[in-house]
Structure formats: C-alpha cells, structure tokens
C-alpha cells in the first residue's frame, strides 16, 4: 500500500526549480542517470547474444563429440581427425556410444542444474541479478576451454573430459538460469501489466537460438571447415558477455529496493530462511506455495504447465529432425530451412502479435475506466484467454502432424503449434504476479528447478516413445504430445481469477467465467 509520503510526492509537479547546485539535477547528470537506468534495452541484446551463441554450438558440439568418440574409440591409429569423423558417419556402434555419452552428459548437467539453479536465483534476491547472469556464463566458458583443448590435442585429452564441461554447465545454471535471471530482471523494472510483452521478447530471444544458431554454425563450418574456429568464436563471445554483464549492465534489484522498500522487507524475513544452506533446494519451492487454496491450485497448474512446456521444447527439435529424415528423407539443408522457418514464425508472433494484442487490451481497459479501483490479479486482461488459446493451438498443431503424414502436414502442424509460442512468457508473467516482489528470485529459482527436472525426464521419455514406435507408428509421439497438451488445456479451465474483465471476448468458450470480486 502506498504511504502518504509517496502519495504527496506523486502529486508534486514533474519539473521544479533546482534548490541548489546539485549535480544530479543538472542537464548532464540527469541525462546520465536516465541513461544508466535499468531497462530491458540493456538486457535484451546481451541475452540474445548469449542465446544465439548457445544455439550456434548445437551442430559443432555434436560433430566434436562424434569425432572424438570416433577418433579415440574406433580409429585410434588414424591421425586425421576429420577423416576419422567421415569414416565413422555410418557406424552403428559409434552412434550407440554417442547416444550413451549424451545420456550421461544430460543427466549430469540436469541434476547439477536442478541443485544450483534454484539456489542461485534465491541468492539473486540478496546479491542482485547481475552476479547470477555473470555466473551463468562461466560454465559455458569453461566448457569451451575443455572442448578446445580436446580438439587441439585429441590424442591427449580424452572425450570423457567433456563431461566436466557438462558438469560446469549445470553448476552455473547455463541458459536456464540466464533465462530465469533475465525474467527476474524484467520483473524488477516493469509493472505487472507490462510483463507479458517484456517476457515475450525474452522468449523470442530464446527461440532465436534455434532459428539463427544452426544457420550461423553452418556458415562458420562452410567458411572455415573446422570446428576449432567455431569454438574460439564462442569462447570470445562468452568472455565478452562476462565483461558486458560486469561493467555495462545496470543492476535492477538496487533500483527496485530503493523505490519499493524491498530491502526493508528482506531484512524482516525469518532468520532461518535467510540462512538457508546452498544445497537446501526444497527451500526455494516455498515461493510456489500461497496460503489460500484457490491461489495454490492456480499456481500448481501454471507452474507444472510451464515446466512441461519447457521440457518438451528441449527434446522436440532433434525428434522433429529424426522424424522428417525417416519419413521424407530430408537432409541438412531442408531440415535447417524447416527449423529456421518455424522458429522465425514463432519469433514474429512473440515480438509483433503479442505486444500489439496486449497494448490493445490495456487501451480498451483504460478507455472503459475499468482499471480504476480494481485489485491486482494474477491473470490480467486477456492473459487467461491467451493461455487457453495457445494450448488449443498446440493441440491442433501436434494432431495435424500425427494425422497428415506428408511434408505439408509437418510444416503446417509445426506452424500452428509455433503460433502458441506466447504460452511460455504468459505463464511466467502470471507466476511472477502470484508472489510478493521480494520473493521473485525465489519463485523463479523454483521454476528453474522444475525446468532442470523436466529437461531430464521429458526428453528421455519422448526419445523412448519415438524409439519404441518409429518402426510401426512414427507419428505416435506427436499424437501423444497433442493428448498431453489437451490435458493441460482442460486443467486451465479450472484456473480461477477474481477479475471483472473478460479474456478474449471473440472466443467465449475460452473466457474466464469466474464471479466478480
């Protein structure tokens, strides 16, 4: 609740005569303070560069791991690394060893990430978002060094050392923690009604990793014809990001503490919570448990849906490539064009459609005068309807792929499912409005924990289903994904919201019919 002092200050004129020779009120000082104010425009370019770099390493990482396994395990007498890689291309034993290695790396990184991510985000409420973003880059940087050492000295550095890179990646939180820390940064500096649009830009940057990353990697490999140059470039970018996060990015939490008094609230928290140990992962989940039953149900549905969506997105891309290669014999060029086209469409929806739609809803709300005197709710105007509409689009997209067994069906179904890209930022925005401002880091840390768990379970389950059915019904996986999305769509109908504003009036069956508050 706003204090009387704040109310008086807000009624003062914006422009007043300077009372003294205060530098902060001079033209230069005021401009510099405004320039260094925390803003999404500071964060988004850095996060986008981070995400695209991670995406551009997908192909080089695959080839480097495959080449090292082939050279060290199956062609130890062959001194030519590239020639050994070409000879092992169709070796089923090499493919089996590669698959087993990826399982070890994924489980190791996922478990360590599940431990480190929530605690790092919990610490961010005390030490700020910048240090966490900085830590999230250290793991990939160390992994780059290990891979470079293995590529330069393939006979001396065993491929098992790459697992140390996976471990460092997990301990630093990597892209998962960088994403949640970026979302916390946005939450610190934005009003609740503006978060969907801001989170959409974060999601668009994350999607750009899959859209632009493989294209960049393919271009680098075609120009340099070597994996080493690609990793040296990634090393340079990660090193530059450390400098940018340290020196250029303004801290968001300090500004929030000064303006909203969160620093005082933090000191009043129970001492036991403030002294929670690093490995007490479950303590972070307390940010997900509201007191009343209705809010608790809402948060469970939203959090589980968001975590499942993340797990599916992490495991779906390689299976889409495998399905298209098996069914339609698509090769690298066709697969790259397919992934780029689908992800660019998702980016367009995120950066153009969602902000325009949400701004239109807010303008209509202000024009009708409905925002005055209304309590803040977890689901703003249009948000609950957006969640249900996106889930419906994903159901339709996956079912289209499962039913229409043709290249056109895969493309159309993927574009339809890609139209549901606003689902993740909308869910995250709603989650941040369910807890106090001083608990944002703890909340997003718990979300990071769920992400790490779903990153292990769902891709493993999807690979098992596809491997078990590819010989008879290769489209069964997409039918299962459509069924799962349908379950979450039904669950979203049980979400309650004490709001007088309807969601997306054009779709009355998707509207929120809860009673007026």
Curated annotation (Swiss-Prot):
GO cellular component: membrane
Glycosylated residues, chain numbering: 63, 265, 497, 512
Entry keywords, A to Z: Glycoprotein, Membrane, Transmembrane, Transmembrane helix, Transport
Segments of this protein annotated with the region Disordered: 1-28
Residue ranges with Basic and acidic residues bias: 1-12
SUPFAM superfamilies, A to Z: MFS general substrate transporter
Topology of this chain in the membrane: Multi-pass membrane protein
GO molecular function: transmembrane transporter activity
Pathway membership, UniProt: Secondary metabolite biosynthesis
Chief place where the protein resides: membrane
Subcellular localization, as worded in the UniProt entry: Membrane
One Pfam family, short name: MFS_1
Transmembrane segments: 40-60, 103-123, 131-151, 161-181, 204-224, 230-250, 299-319, 338-358, 391-411, 442-462, 476-496
Family stated for the protein in its record: Belongs to the major facilitator superfamily. TCR/Tet family.
PANTHER family named in the record: TETRACYCLINE-EFFLUX TRANSPORTER, ZGC:174356
Primary role: MFS-type transporter; part of the cluster that mediates the biosynthesis of a highly modified cyclo-arginine-tryptophan dipeptide (cRW).
Protein name: MFS-type transporter avaJ
Source organism per UniProt: Aspergillus versicolor
Annotated gene: avaJ
